[in-house]
Regions:
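Glycine-rich phosphate/adenylate-binding loop and adjacent beta-alpha elements
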Residues: 127-149
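Intrinsic disorder at enzyme termini
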Residues: 35, 41-61, 286-288, 292-303
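Eukaryote-biased recognition of intrinsically disordered, low-complexity regulatory segments
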Residues: 63-83
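Short, contiguous acidic and Ser/Thr-rich linear segments
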Residues: 82-92
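Short, structured protein-protein interaction patches enriched in aromatics and acidic/basic residues
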Residues: 115-122
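Short linear motifs in low-complexity or flexible loops
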Residues: 2, 8-10, 16, 24-25, ...
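Ferredoxin-type iron-sulfur electron-transfer modules in oxidoreductases and energy-metabolism complexes
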Residues: 92-107, 150-306
Length: 306
C-alpha cells in the first residue's frame, strides 16, 4: 500500500462505495459559488471553531454511541477495517473520537494531529469518502450509521491514518514555491492594498498545506508528475507577485506537458478546501496569464494548454 499510486477509476469506484453521493466533478458548484464572490471562511463552514477550543477529556455517560470504522495498516501487513464504538455528544469531533479510542481502547492506533482547533491542518483524513479535517468534523453532522475513516488518498501511508507528506513538499519544490527576491539594493515593496494584483493574491494566499486538495484530485491519481492543486495555487500567488524574480523560470515548469495542461477543471480541490480557497480558479488564471504570454512571445513559450 505504501508508495503505490491508485488508478483513477479505482479511486472513483472506491469512493462511490463509501459515499454514494460522491461524483468526480462535485466541486464545480462550489467553484461557481466562489466565482460569484462567495467565500466561506473557516468560521462559517460546518464544524467551525466554536465550542472546540478545549481538549476533550472524556464522554458523558448516556451520550449516543457512534461506530467508527477505521482503516488500519502496518508495514508488512495487509490493510484491514476495524470497528470502534465511542460515546459521542453533540460537539464530539472525529478527532475527539480517535483520541478516545487511542486512550481507552487501542493505544496502537496511529493518526496525526497538533492544534485541535482548525489551524494547523495536520489531522486531514477521509471521512465517509470525503476529505476533511478531523478536528473540524463533528460526528453529529455525519448522519446515522457507521462512520468510515481512512488516510488521505495519493499519499504513501506510514501507518494507519498517518501519511507521508514528503511527496506534497516535493511537488511544492518542483514548481518553485518559494518567493525569490531580487538582488542588489534593498527597496521597500509597494503593492497597493486595493490593486487587482494584491486582491488576487489575497484570495489564494491562505493555504496551510494540509493536503486535502491533493487527496481529492483525480489527476494526481494517475499522473505522478502533475504538481497538484496546492502547488499550482501557490505558483499562481508568486506569478502574480511583481516582486518575485523567478517567474520566467517558473513558467518553464508550469507550461510543461504535465502541469497546467493536465488539470481537467473538476474543482474537487475547491470543494474540499477547509480554508475556502479555490485552487481551480488559480489554475484558470494561470492559464489565462500563460495564454497572454504565448500570444506576446510566441508558441515556443508553451504547449497546448487546454
Amino acid at each position: 500500500m505504501a508508495g503505490q499510486e491508485l488508478d483513477a477509476q479505482a479511486v472513483h469506484q472506491r469512493r462511490a462505495r463509501v459515499d454514494p453521493g460522491w461524483h468526480p466533478a462535485r466541486g464545480l458548484s462550489r467553484l461557481a459559488e466562489s466565482a460569484r464572490g462567495h467565500r466561506a471562511g473557516p468560521a462559517l463552514r460546518p464544524g467551525g471553531l466554536a465550542g472546540r477550543h478545549r481538549p476533550r477529556r472524556g464522554c458523558v455517560r448516556g451520550e449516543a454511541i457512534a461506530t467508527l470504522r477505521v482503516l488500519r495498516w502496518l508495514p508488512g501487513a495487509d490493510e484491514r477495517w476495524q470497528d470502534y464504538a465511542v460515546e459521542a455528544g453533540a460537539d464530539t469531533t472525529v478527532l475527539d473520537a480517535l483520541v478516545e479510542i487511542q486512550r481507552g481502547q487501542d493505544p496502537g492506533l496511529a493518526f496525526r494531529y497538533a492544534c485541535r482547533v482548525g489551524m494547523c491542518g495536520s489531522c486531514g483524513v477521509v471521512v465517509n469518502g470525503r476529505e476533511r479535517w478531523a478536528c473540524r468534523t463533528p460526528l453529529s453532522t455525519l448522519g446515522p450509521g457507521r462512520i468510515t475513516v481512512r488516510p488521505l488518498y495519493h499519499f504513501p501511508v506510514l501507518r494507519d491514518l498517518v501519511v507521508d507528506m514528503a511527496p506534497f513538499t516535493a511537488r511544492m519544490r518542483a514548481v518553485g514555491a518559494a518567493f525569490t527576491p531580487g538582488d542588489g539594493e534593498r527597496r521597500d515593496a509597494r503593492i497597493s492594498g486595493d490593486s487587482a494584483e494584491r486582491q488576487e493574491i489575497d484570495e489564494a494566499i491562505e493555504c496551510i498545506g494540509c493536503g486535502l486538495c491533493v487527496s481529492a484530485c483525480t489527476i494526481v491519481a494517475h499522473n505522478a508528475r502533475f504538481p497538484g492543486p496546492a502547488a499550482l495555487n501557490r505558483a499562481f500567488t508568486l506569478q502574480r507577485d511583481s516582486r518575485d524574480t523567478a517567474r520566467s523560470t517558473r513558467w518553464g515548469v508550469l507550461l510543461s506537458d504535465d502541469a497546467l495542461a493536465r488539470c481537467h477543471g473538476q474543482a474537487n480541490c475547491t470543494d474540499v478546501c477547509p480554508m475556502g480557497l479555490a485552487p481551480t480558479r488559480s489554475i484558470i488564471r494561470l492559464r489565462q496569464m500563460a495564454t497572454a504570454r504565448i500570444f506576446k512571445w510566441g508558441p515556443r513559450y508553451g504547449p497546448r494548454l487546454f
